[in-house]
Amino acid sequence: MTTKRTFQPKKRHRERVHGFMKRMSTKNGRKVLARRRAKGRKVLSA
C-alpha cells in the first residue's frame, strides 16, 4: 500500500477557508490582514 498525496487542491475550498472574505468576517482574521499589511505582503490572502 502506497502513501497517498495529501494535498488535493480545490479552488473553492481554498477561497472559502483562506480567502479575503473569510479573513474579514472575524476579528482575528482582520488582525491577520493587518499584520500582513504591516509586513508589506503583496498578497494578503488566498
Swiss-Prot record:
Keyword Ribonucleoprotein attributed: yes
Record keywords: Ribonucleoprotein, Ribosomal protein
Highest taxon, organism lineage: Bacteria
Matching Pfam families: Ribosomal_L34 (PF00468)
Biological process per Gene Ontology, one example term: translation
Chain segments carrying region Disordered: 26-46
An annotated Gene Ontology molecular function: structural constituent of ribosome
Signal peptide: none
CC annotations in GO: ribonucleoprotein complex; ribosome
Family from the record: Belongs to the bacterial ribosomal protein bL34 family.
Name the UniProt record assigns to this protein: Large ribosomal subunit protein bL34
Organism: Lacticaseibacillus paracasei (strain ATCC 334 / BCRC 17002 / CCUG 31169 / CIP 107868 / KCTC 3260 / NRRL B-441) (Lactobacillus paracasei)
Lineage, uppermost ranks: Bacteria, Bacillati, Bacillota, Bacilli, Lactobacillales
Gene: rpmH
